[in-house]
């Protein structure tokens, strides 16, 4: 035993002996269990020494676990003991064996997930897909099951909601799990409308397909029989392969996972798109100083999802970057939490940090420490504040329950529930008088006369029944058929206090269904009385009993016994309540309230109420009083700081008012909701049913309670006239109209409520859109109607009424704007108005009506009517109808005269869609299952680009119809299109990636779609080659277009009011016009090439239309592009030809300005040439003709480039005055000043002034006494300047400053007559020299050059710093097509767009976006105690 007892020592043994054998049991593990286990291990031929370590226990567990299923009880006990021991070794606390086993299970599950993840990351998972689009049928063949409409719909919705944000990629990946290329193309096609994105995607797919073909060359020779061909790039993209081939590749042995490969290509493309739409790196996500932590976490994870990294790297980012990039307030808290904190803990800890409440809390803590003493000192002024006491029993202030004289309330005083007393209550706040005990949620509601008691409004309420109370519980009423009484309702949100009349006196009394007797205080009643004692809460009270007293309550009379005595509150007990038919109604409306929050960091709306007219205030007061009675709204006090404006409008065609609340501000601040329904149901998707009913839910929103915590934000105020009293404040208890959450919450409640009914009655179809219900079944009408009543009962139980007024039993049914008949449907009758003048608003309504009608009336057009609305016009502007619009309207009227019907969908038959071209870019289509029985029709007239052709438009129509088919019926129809197969093939070979068309056949309905011309892919040998070009002047709008041919012909035409793009097109048009039936054209315009290569057959541009006409007449045309201005033969010549007089004429208007400037500043020719765009010849001519400048010709000064901190100083003399000149050697920049005397003091002062303006490191002077003086040395020492001296008597050592002195004197001479004093002329000359003379290095002026030199110097130094720092970084990177991160490599250089790295002695350039740069923390990284420092990239 001794040997084995050493398995656990000290602390571990203590922990072992605390663990129970079974949960809740008394027996615990002892040393004997370890000894037993070691003996047992020997029996199983396992080494007992393994028990001493964690690793050993793990190995034993691995050996024993597989045999547990078949092992004996002893084996299981042994396994359990070892699992517990394994956790004791790891110092992980477990309370009993079961907990240890659960932990093990969890650990193994996690491990399994990781390994699965790893295998998935390594490559495409083996075996068949996870989503199972490919299934094995009973014969063992692999068959394809196409993507479900739900999947496609989800995908479309993702793109609509998220555009191309990072979440799109994981969503795509999940939705397309295991899909074939054909499925993937279907997915892409459903979002084909996003053309720019699809174009980018297409380019990526093309590149990847080309790369695939390069890496997988075709094997020579025929394919051996029985062997499959290898897929090419276009096969993988699903364009040149059939579905059968794709399945065969994916399921062969070994498989070629074409679906996964194509998916990888698409994801590469989506990555590019995402980067374009939201270019954010995870390193840039930093928490703002006042940003709530929750928002920061949302942004962080949103970006993290988009990062292309393995799970490990992402895990690392979460652990380090999340904390690191938090703001200082949150970072302090997060660091205190320690490294192992979960995200939940972090969120909780950082809640409210940085916000005003957080600051206030910190301030309050500080204040409480500082001011506690001060408050105590002032205490003598008053004898401590008395705490106001309140009675638990009656709710009045001033006494406690023990001394209360009111009748004793039953149940707990704190929560109001029976079955326990207050001392045992678990509830925290006293809640007795808000009797919302049984139902924590929900509200009272209005009940119409037909409503029954089973109606269950959503809260406990008292109902006082009117009329003949002798009816036993008004039984007839209960059936919902009897008299139509409207009961007063008293909700229990406040105490049910009413005004009663007793013996002609008015009193307030509490309706108390828990009291047997009626007890009143302080009232004198006539007649005899008997003394009586009754038991109350505070003991017994003496009362006088009066019999046969008449009381009037809520307009109902009752006669009975009344007790008069010292009761704290007047009580009407059951003896009276039963007489007036008062009942307590418990709701059965457990509609759960949906919890709603504001957006993080936002507060409720605080919008002031605007003034209202008297009649509106009256109307609103009435409406709100009514709503309050019904429990839809409640009054609130001034403690609620929120407000939303309210106003009133007249109802349509009525004198009644409607209350409108302007919830725009609250809507901005409310969280977002997922719209439960993505669109409106369409009748063409309904299956034909024998019996149909249409119902409408009454007061839909007001039947659903609003989350209690959210109600305060819906507060609004009814103002008073002339502000004579404060406004009345209310808040909503139910879903308000106009609030953004109402539709989603109502619909989800409705779905939950209908679910049990749908389950019980699967044969009944219920379409629910908001409060419209369509119920169809194949039952005979009697049974059907019985089911309808069941449904109405079911809805009533939840508090939803279905008013008879809107209950449609007989066809035709009006539903959602449609008219439904038993075997056909149409849109509700459409009346087009006849008007003499039309406003913008009228035309908008007209177009809306026609669009609505077009879903069943084929041939409706609105193009010309829409044209009338172009431009920004006011709604009331009158618009004259054009002749085309008149004609279009007349045609539409004709079409609408004959009523047209659609039929219903039969799932057993195929869907067929037929498309016709109507001309003028308008298309019409019909979807049917049997000829001449359309399910629905539609039109398409959207032009996506300025230049288009019919084939392109046809593909757009097909995509629209396919999407519609998926949404309504869940499948794509077969298409019948007016285009020949050959025409389609020609177009499609060029454009297959951008367009996908499902199964289709040719149908000969003119006009047929055709390609009118074709461009050659190779130059035409023997045809004349035209080099074309155009140029235009932006200011004058004048231009030229022309060509030169390889046969020496040339032509140029002048154009007015044109642009560069137009002239390029004009030149092509000239070439086509002047050439034979075959022609080669070379242009340098990408714009023109792009338009013509897309084969347009119509365009909004007149010139493009002319080009199209010319192209149609040619036999063969080849069009090619060359880059401009690259000296390419014919292109360069034609460029010169069209440019003369256009591009170079521009300098003429610059000459005058240049001459004017030269007269002022005498700038040199280089400065003028660059500032005024003058040719050098002209600029030199200006200098030559100036009498002051041609004396000595141009000064030459090409400096030697010296280090940036050196200046030369010297004194020169002019007009008997001393000028001190400093020159920046490297740039030739001058600072100069007239000084009173040549002394050390003046020189020192000048040097300090210079050092304050520029970085001066070294000054170079001659040996003059002023420069060698002690004062100058002191100034140089203070400013950190090194002083150097020239060689005595050798003026060349001061060469730079000497030549500058000459130059300066020359300039002073040129401007001297413009200034009175020499010192002014010196500064003018300095300005001219520094900024008006260009030349030397870089053709800069001296001022530009000094700035450039200093900036370059700073950058170079920074770079040096970076290079030394950069050694501390490591780079993780991805190669061109491999998605796995490699590294770490050494960082050699980091630029804007790329980084240079060293990976195993190989130097690589990696695009910036494919590299992650991480600080290298050395070996300690591995330790637990490592605290990572800054992670950003320098």
UniProtKB/Swiss-Prot annotation:
Regulation of its function: Protease: The viral protease is inhibited by many synthetic protease inhibitors (PIs), such as amprenavir, atazanavir, indinavir, loprinavir, nelfinavir, ritonavir and saquinavir. Use of protease inhibitors in tritherapy regimens permit more ambitious therapeutic strategies. Reverse transcriptase/ribonuclease H: RT can be inhibited either by nucleoside RT inhibitors (NRTIs) or by non nucleoside RT inhibitors (NNRTIs).
Domain Reverse transcriptase: 630-820
Protein name per Swiss-Prot or TrEMBL: Gag-Pol polyprotein
Record-listed Mg(2+) 2 binding positions: 1029, 1064, 1084, 1135
A Pfam match: zf-CCHC
Region of interest: Interaction with membrane phosphatidylinositol 4,5-bisphosphate and RNA: 14-33
DNA-binding stretch(es), residue numbering of this chain: 1369-1416
Motif residue range(s): Nuclear export signal: 16-22
PROSITE patterns membership: ASP_PROT_RETROV, ASP_PROTEASE, INTEGRASE, INTEGRASE_DBD, RNASE_H_1, RT_POL, ZF_CCHC, ZF_INTEGRASE
Catalytic activity line of the entry: Specific for a P1 residue that is hydrophobic, and P1' variable, but often Pro; Endohydrolysis of RNA in RNA/DNA hybrids. Three different cleavage modes: 1. sequence-specific internal cleavage of RNA. Human immunodeficiency virus type 1 and Moloney murine leukemia virus enzymes prefer to cleave the RNA strand one nucleotide away from the RNA-DNA junction. 2. RNA 5'-end directed cleavage 13-19 nucleotides from the RNA end. 3. DNA 3'-end directed cleavage 15-20 nucleotides away from the primer terminus; 3'-end directed exonucleolytic cleavage of viral RNA-DNA hybrid; DNA(n) + a 2'-deoxyribonucleoside 5'-triphosphate = DNA(n+1) + diphosphate
Positions marked as site (Cleavage): 132-133, 363-364, 376-377, 431-432, 439-440, 487-488, 586-587, 1026-1027, 1146-1147
PANTHER family: ENDOGENOUS RETROVIRUS GROUP K MEMBER POL PROTEIN (PTHR41694), RNA-DIRECTED DNA POLYMERASE-RELATED (PTHR41694:SF3)
Annotated Basic and acidic residues bias: 103-112
Ranges annotated as spanning the membrane: none
Residue numbers binding Mg(2+) 1: 696, 771-772
Keywords annotated in UniProt: Activation of host caspases by virus, AIDS, Aspartyl protease, Capsid protein, DNA integration, DNA recombination, DNA-binding, DNA-directed DNA polymerase, Endonuclease, Eukaryotic host gene expression shutoff by virus, Eukaryotic host translation shutoff by virus, Host cell membrane, Host cytoplasm, Host endosome, Host gene expression shutoff by virus, Host membrane, Host nucleus, Host-virus interaction, Hydrolase, Lipid-binding, Lipoprotein, Magnesium, Membrane, Metal-binding, Modulation of host cell apoptosis by virus, Multifunctional enzyme, Myristate, Nuclease, Nucleotidyltransferase, Phosphoprotein, Protease, Repeat, RNA-binding, RNA-directed DNA polymerase, Transferase, Viral genome integration, Viral nucleoprotein, Viral penetration into host nucleus, Viral release from host cell, Virion, Virion maturation, Virus entry into host cell, Zinc, Zinc-finger
Record GO biological process: DNA integration; DNA recombination; establishment of integrated proviral latency; proteolysis; symbiont entry into host cell; symbiont-mediated activation of host apoptosis; symbiont-mediated suppression of host gene expression; viral genome integration into host DNA
Keyword Nucleotide-binding attached: no
Stretches for region Interaction with Gp41: 7-31
Cofactor note: Binds 2 magnesium ions for reverse transcriptase polymerase activity. Binds 2 magnesium ions for ribonuclease H (RNase H) activity. Substrate-binding is a precondition for magnesium binding.
Coiled-coil positions: none
Gene source species: Human immunodeficiency virus type 1 group M subtype F2 (isolate MP257) (HIV-1)
Top-level division of the source organism's lineage: Viruses
Motif (Nuclear localization signal): 26-32
Region (RT 'primer grip'): 813-821
Region of interest (Interaction with human PPIA/CYPA and NUP153), residue spans: 189-227
């Amino acid at each position: 035993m001794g040997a084995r007892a050493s398995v656990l020592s000290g602390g571990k043994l203590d922990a072992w002996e605390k663990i129970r054998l079974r949960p809740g049991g008394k027996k615990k593990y002892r040393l004997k269990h370890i000894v037993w286990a070691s003996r047992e291990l020997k029996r199983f031929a396992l080494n007992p020494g393994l028990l001493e370590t964690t690793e050993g226990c793990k190995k034993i567990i691995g050996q024993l676990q597989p045999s547990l299923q078949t092992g004996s009880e002893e084996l299981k006990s042994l396994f359990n003991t070892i699992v517990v021991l394994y956790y004791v070794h790891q110092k992980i606390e477990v309370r009993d064996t079961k907990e240890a086993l659960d932990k093990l299970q969890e650990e193994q599950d996690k491990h399994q997930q990781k390994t699965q993840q790893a295998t998935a990351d390594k490559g495409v998972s083996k075996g068949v897909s996870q989503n199972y689009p490919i299934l094995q049928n009973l014969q063992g063949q692999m068959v394809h099951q196409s993507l479900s409409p739900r999947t496609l719909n989800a995908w479309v919705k993702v793109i609509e909601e998220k555009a191309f944000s990072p979440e799109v990629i994981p969503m795509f990946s999940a939705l397309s799990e295991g899909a074939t290329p054909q499925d993937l193309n279907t997915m892409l096609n459903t979002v084909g409308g996003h053309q720019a994105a699809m174009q980018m995607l297409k380019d990526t797919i093309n590149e990847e397909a080309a790369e695939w073909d390069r890496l997988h060359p075709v094997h020579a020779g025929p394919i051996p029989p029985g062997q499959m061909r290898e897929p090419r790039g276009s096969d993988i993209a699903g364009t040149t392969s059939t579905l059968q081939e794709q399945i065969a590749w994916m399921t062969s042995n070994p498989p070629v996972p074409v679906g996964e490969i194509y998916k990888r290509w698409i994801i590469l493309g989506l990555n590019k798109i995402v980067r374009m739409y939201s270019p954010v790196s995870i390193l840039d996500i930093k928490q703002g100083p006042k940003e709530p932590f929750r928002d920061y976490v949302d942004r962080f994870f949103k970006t993290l999802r988009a990062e292309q990294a393995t799970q490990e790297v992402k895990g690392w980012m979460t652990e380090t970057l999340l904390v690191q990039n938090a703001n200082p307030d949150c970072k302090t808290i997060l660091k205190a939490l320690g490294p192992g904190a979960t995200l939940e803990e972090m969120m909780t800890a950082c809640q409210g940090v940085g916000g005003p409440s957080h600051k206030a809390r910190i301030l309050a803590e500080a204040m409480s420490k500082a001011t506690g003493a001060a408050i105590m000192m002032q205490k003598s002024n008053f004898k401590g504040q008395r705490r106001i006491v309140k009675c638990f029993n009656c709710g009045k202030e001033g006494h406690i329950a023990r001394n209360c004289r009111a009748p004793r309330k039953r149940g707990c005083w704190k929560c109001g529930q029976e079955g326990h007393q207050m001392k045992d209550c678990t509830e925290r706040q006293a809640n007795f008088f808000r009797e919302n005990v049984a139902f924590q949620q929900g509200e009272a509601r209005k009940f119409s006369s037909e409503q029954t008691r089973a109606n269950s409004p959503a809260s406990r309420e008292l109902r006082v029944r009117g009329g003949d109370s002798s009816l036993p519980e008004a039984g007839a009423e209960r059936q919902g058929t009897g008299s139509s009484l409207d009961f007063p309702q008293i909700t229990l949100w406040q105490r049910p206090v009413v005004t009663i009349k007793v013996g002609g006196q008015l009193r307030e009394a509490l309706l108390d269904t828990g009291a047997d007797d009626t007890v009143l205080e302080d009232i004198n009643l006539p007649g005899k009385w008997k003394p009586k004692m009754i038991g109350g809460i505070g003991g017994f009270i003496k009362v006088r009993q009066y019999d046969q007293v008449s009381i009037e309550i809520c307009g109902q009379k009752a006669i009975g016994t009344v007790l008069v005595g010292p009761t704290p509150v007047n009580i009407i007990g059951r003896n009276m309540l039963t007489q007036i038919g008062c009942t307590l109604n418990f709701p059965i409306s457990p509609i759960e309230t949906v919890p709603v929050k504001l957006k993080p960091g936002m507060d409720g709306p605080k919008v002031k109420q605007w003034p209202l007219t008297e009649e509106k205030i009256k109307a609103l007061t009435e409406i709100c009083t009514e709503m309050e009675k019904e429990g839809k709204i409640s009054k609130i006090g001034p403690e609620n700081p929120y407000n939303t404006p309210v106003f009133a409008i007249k109802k349509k065609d009525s004198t009644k008012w409607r209350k409108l609340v302007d919830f725009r501000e609250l809507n901005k601040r409310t969280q977002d909701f997922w719209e439960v329904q993505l669109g409106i149901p369409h009748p063409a998707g309904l299956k034909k049913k024998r019996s149909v009913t249409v119902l409408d839910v009454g007061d839909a929103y007001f039947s659903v309670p609003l989350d209690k915590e959210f109600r305060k934000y819906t507060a609004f105020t009814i103002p008073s006239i002339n502000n004579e009293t404060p406004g009345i404040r209310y808040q909503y208890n139910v879903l308000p109209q106009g609030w953004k959450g109402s539709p989603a919450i109502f619909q989800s409640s409705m779905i939950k409520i209908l679910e049990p009914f749908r389950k019980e009655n699967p044969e009944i179809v219920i379409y629910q859109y908001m409060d419209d219900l369509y119920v169809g079944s194949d039952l005979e009408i009697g049974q059907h109607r019985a089911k309808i009543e069941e449904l109405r009962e079911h809805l009533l139980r939840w508090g939803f009424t279905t008013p008879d007024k809107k209950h449609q039993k007989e066809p035709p049914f009006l539903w959602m704007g449609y008219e439904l008949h038993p075997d056909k449907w149409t849109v509700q009758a459409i009346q087009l108005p006849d008007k003499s003048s039309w406003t913008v608003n009228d035309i908008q309504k007209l177009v809306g009506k026609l669009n609505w009608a077009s879903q069943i009336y084929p041939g409706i057009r609105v193009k010309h009517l829409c044209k009338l609305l172009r431009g920004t016009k006011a709604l009331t502007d009158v618009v004259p109808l054009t002749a085309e619009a008149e004609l279009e309207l007349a045609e539409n009227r004709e079409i609408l005269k004959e009523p047209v019907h659609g039929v219903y969908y039969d799932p057993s038959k195929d869907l067929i869609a037929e498309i016709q071209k109507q001309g003028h870019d308008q298309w019409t289509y019909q979807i049917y299952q049997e000829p001449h029985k359309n399910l629905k029709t539609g039109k398409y007239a959207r032009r996506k680009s300025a230049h288009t052709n019919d084939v392109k438009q046809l593909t757009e129509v097909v995509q629209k119809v396919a999407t519609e088919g998926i949404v309504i019926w869940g499948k794509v129809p077969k298409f019948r299109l007016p285009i020949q197969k050959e025409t389609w093939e020609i177009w499609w070979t060029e454009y297959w990636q951008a367009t996908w068309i499902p199964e289709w056949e040719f149908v000969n309905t003119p006009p047929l779609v055709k390609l009118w011309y074709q461009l050659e892919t190779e130059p035409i040998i023997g045809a004349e080659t035209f080099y074309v070009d155009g140029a235009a002047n932006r200011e004058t709008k004048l231009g030229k277009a022309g060509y030169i041919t390889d046969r020496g012909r040339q032509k140029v035409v002048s154009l007015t009011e044109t642009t560069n793009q137009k002239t390029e097109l004009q030149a092509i048009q000239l070439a086509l016009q002047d050439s034979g039936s075959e022609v080669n054209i070379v242009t340098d315009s990408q714009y023109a090439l792009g338009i013509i290569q897309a084969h347009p057959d119509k365009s909004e541009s007149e010139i493009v239309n002319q080009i199209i006409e010319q192209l149609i007449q040619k036999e063969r045309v080849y069009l090619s592009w060359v880059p401009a201005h690259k000296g390419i033969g014919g292109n360069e010549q034609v460029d010169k030809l069209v440019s003369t007089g256009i591009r170079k004429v521009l300098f003429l208007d610059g000459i005058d300005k240049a001459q004017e400037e030269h007269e002022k500043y005498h700038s040199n020719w280089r400065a003028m040439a660059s500032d005024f765009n003058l040719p050098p010849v002209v600029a030199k001519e200006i200098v030559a003709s100036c009498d002051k400048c041609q004396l000595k010709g141009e000064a030459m000064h090409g400096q030697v480039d010296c280090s940036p901190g050196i200046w030369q100083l010297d004194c020169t003399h002019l007009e008997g005055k001393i000028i001190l000149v400093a020159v920046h050697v490297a740039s030739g920049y001058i600072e100069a000043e007239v000084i009173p005397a040549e002394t050390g003091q003046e020189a020192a002062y000048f040097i300090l002034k210079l050092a304050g303006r520029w970085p001066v490191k070294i000054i170079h002077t001659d040996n003059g006494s002023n420069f060698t003086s002690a004062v100058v040395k002191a100034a140089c020492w203070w400013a950190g300047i090194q002083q150097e001296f020239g060689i005595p008597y050798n003026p060349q050592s001061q060469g730079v400053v000497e030549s500058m002195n000459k130059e300066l004197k020359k300039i002073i001479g040129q401007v001297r007559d413009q200034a009175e004093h020499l010192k002014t002329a010196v500064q003018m000359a300095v300005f001219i020299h520094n900024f008006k003379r260009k030349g030397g290095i870089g053709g800069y002026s001296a001022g530009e050059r000094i700035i450039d030199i200093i900036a370059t110097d700073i950058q170079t130094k920074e770079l040096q710093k970076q290079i030394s720092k950069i050694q501390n970084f490591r780079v993780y990177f991805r190669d061109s097509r491999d998605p796995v991160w490699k590294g770490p490599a050494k960082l050699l250089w980091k630029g804007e767009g790329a980084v240079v790295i060293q990976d195993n002695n190989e130097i690589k350039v990696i695009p910036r976006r494919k590299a992650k740069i991480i600080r290298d923390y050395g070996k300690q990284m591995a330790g637990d105690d490592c605290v990572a420092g800054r992670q950003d990239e320098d």
